[in-house]
Each structure stands twice: as structure tokens, then as C-alpha cells.
């Protein structure tokens, strides 16, 4: 999103992205089953700050972001790396938090920040409860080249039995994200490249022309997680350790950036005043602010997923009605667009 870009620029990360790895999202559409109707989100002429914009958002490969983030902090004298290590124990007391690594080293500090995935070991060990949602679905991710242009338009296709997200990279290269029943995933994984590409082409009515698989296929089970609170004594959760989203809204990474932005601002202000950065009041303030960001979006997304993955006749009618109503309500579309553009 545009706010996420601003955060990454402020951290000196965005500037390190190769220009050809930053892909622009010009529009987005949502489709339901085999209906020709689509909910369309064009690029607004300006954001909420009345600044001119020409894109809904940006697509940048994960490995590019990780590499740029690593490069951006090289040379910082106040940073110490412990690469290739794993946390095997952690605890906190009135004055500090400590972690023990798998090589026996112990590290202590005023505040422990956990960013160790939605399956966070630190979250569990520190006694922070989390609500976990097993979707019973797998996600397959791969890239397809295609004959006709994608017009830099993302499409979220809620078919009956599976969901297909098409994320435009270049005009003739698209990242595909297939979500389907975990029991059916092996069938797609067993397909050769040509068969898989033809399968996707047929699903979208051949509107991209001939398609060709140009990457490996990555597969993982889909689990959503939301911690009931984002802190405990001298420990705070950020990123997926705090909230692991369903990918349908593509907001997981954006929420992760927001979490570190909120927490880091509070820490910098506290440190600037010479006060304890592990103060419970600071951590409670972080929890309140980030819960407001994540909780409505997490549960709202899960409700949308539940509706658009049910195959009953009544659900199919309701799905179509929801899209029609959304198209007819400009304020709702504006609210969704504003989440992307700021």
C-alpha cells in the first residue's frame, strides 16, 4: 500500500529495491463463480491527503524486501546479529527479558520483541494466548507468462471450490495464488507445467491468451492467527506473531509494517525521555493501537472467506448480492480503496 511504501522509504529500504522488481497495481477486480459481473476498483485521482496518485498499490517480491531490509541495517553500530540461531527459551522479570539461543548464549534487554512468525515460539513460551483458525485449505503460488496483457489489474476470482488471485507483475507476467481444499491440493501439485497453465487459462476464460508456467510451484497450508493481546511483561509481538492474516486481502505484510511502526515510535519517544522502554503503559498503548488496526480486518476477512468459500445455493446468491451491493455503494468502495492509497 502507499502508507507501507512511506514506512519503507523512511527506513531506507524502498530505495534499495531494483526498479524492475517494483510492480504497479493500476486496478483491481473481484469476480464470483461463473458470473460475468465484477466488482471493480480503479485508481483514484488522488489520495486522502489530496496528493495525485497513479497506482492502487505495489507488488514487490518477498526476497527483494528481505534483502533490502538486511542491506539497510548493515553498519549500524547498535545492532548485533545472531544468524543461524534459534531461540530455545525465554523469560522476563521486573527489570529485563532474556532469551537463550540453541548454542547456549543468553541475551538480555529491557524489551523482547517477538517477530517469529504466526507460529511464534516466543508468543507461546511467554504465555500469550492466540486464536488460531485452520482453514482446511492450501495455498499454491507460482508465476505464469501469458500472451495478452493483464493491464496491471489484479483479479480475485472466487470460483466454486477454489479461489484464484492474479497479481500483475509485468504486462505479460502474473503471479498466481490458488487457494483450495487441502485434500485437492495434491491434484494440482501433480500437474506438469503445461497442464497447470492450461488449467488456469481455462478457469479465467482464456482472457490472457496462451499461458506458460515460468517458476516452481510453492505450496503451504493456510492458518490464520490473532493473538488475544500483543504484549506481556517486557515482551511485545509484531508482524505475524501478532496477527497472521488470510492472504485474500493481501494486507498481512502491511499490518506487519504498521505494528513495527507503532511500536518503534512509542519506544523512540520513551527512550528520548530517558524512560523505561519496557514500561507496561507503553506496551498497553501499543496493544490498543494495533488491535484497532488488526482485529476488525482479521475477523472481517475471515467472514468474507467463509461466505465466499461456502458452496450452498443460498451462499452463492448472497455472494452475488454482496458484490452487486458493494458496486452500488461508492462510499464502501472508497473506504476499501483508501486502505490501499492512504
Protein language model regions, located:
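A general structural signal for well-ordered alpha-helical segments in protein cores
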Residues: 1, 5, 62-66, 137, ...
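Acidic-histidine catalytic/liganding microenvironments
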Residues: 11, 76-77, 329
